[in-house]
């Protein structure tokens, strides 16, 4: 069953200031919670394009959103190809785009997908199950140096070298096949006092491998850069991030977009072409309420950032 607790549901969609006849994009369809709430605000002229690279998510969303079938188009693609996919369908500009960058709970919870360090399964971790690169390939074939790099950069793991060394030692004996084996390796590599602190010892390493398998950070950067070029004046982008790496990328891109070009010295009035094209809709990121956190603990690290294209 495809259950998914939508995070910052109202805030994310409401911050788009939805026009009933507007064209919108849900870049991360997932459990379709944001899509359903947004579709509810559209009239017959309005339309939503919903992206997901996971066919299971699309199949479930089609059932969930059956009442809105004439107002929604489902596109099976990584959101980094959003602009191309929309252009192919004759869409050059949109009124709003939303991103929920969390891994949807069903993917984490389905044992056979191999995302979870709580359940033993084949090492997979692919969002798009048609792609070739899997967690098993990363763990067994990537070099010691590459493993250290991803564990440190994507997992912010202090014990990257120790974990990479233990992986290298084990895979020389036989291939590492399952998430359970990987958890055992991580527990062996991390010193006992550190294992007892800060949640599950596999959390950071699993995050790093998942990001590497799906090129998540590259996709976020590509997609957001293109999303900014798709917005109509007055249009907005809402982005929910769940860890510091994605939040850093989003924050940096938004800050850069809200800067105008460098001004020549001594101008009495700033000409329009020197004014920025974008502004931040909120000075600080929006975070979940205490009430939401009580309902859904996975929302704890969520941050919502919103940018608007200025009408000139």
Swiss-Prot record:
- Tell me the keywords, alphabetical order: Cytoplasm, Methyltransferase, rRNA processing, S-adenosyl-L-methionine, Transferase
Question: Which Gene Ontology terms describe the biological processes this protein takes part in?
Answer: rRNA base methylation
For this protein, what reaction is catalysed?
Answer: cytidine(1402) in 16S rRNA + S-adenosyl-L-methionine = N(4)-methylcytidine(1402) in 16S rRNA + S-adenosyl-L-homocysteine + H(+)
State where the protein is found. Answer: Cytoplasm
> What EC number(s) does this enzyme carry?
2.1.1.199
Cite the GO molecular-function annotations of the record.
rRNA (cytosine-N4-)-methyltransferase activity
- For binding S-adenosyl-L-methionine, which residues are annotated in this chain's numbering? 32-34, 52, 79, 100, 107
Establish whether keyword Methyltransferase is in the entry. Answer: yes
InterPro entries given in the database record: RsmH, SAM-dep_MeTrfase_MraW_recog, SAM-dependent_MTases_sf
- State the superkingdom: Bacteria
Q: Which Gene3D superfamilies match?
A: Putative methyltransferase TM0872, insert domain (1.10.150.170), Vaccinia Virus protein VP39 (3.40.50.150)
Q: Which GO terms describe its cellular component?
A: cytoplasm
- Functional note: Specifically methylates the N4 position of cytidine in position 1402 (C1402) of 16S rRNA.
Listed HAMAP family: 16SrRNA_methyltr_H
**What family does the database annotate?**
Belongs to the methyltransferase superfamily. RsmH family.
* PANTHER family given in the database record: 12S RRNA N4-METHYLCYTIDINE METHYLTRANSFERASE, S-ADENOSYL-METHYLTRANSFERASE MRAW
Task: Identify this protein by name.
Answer: Ribosomal RNA small subunit methyltransferase H
Q: What gene makes this protein?
A: rsmH
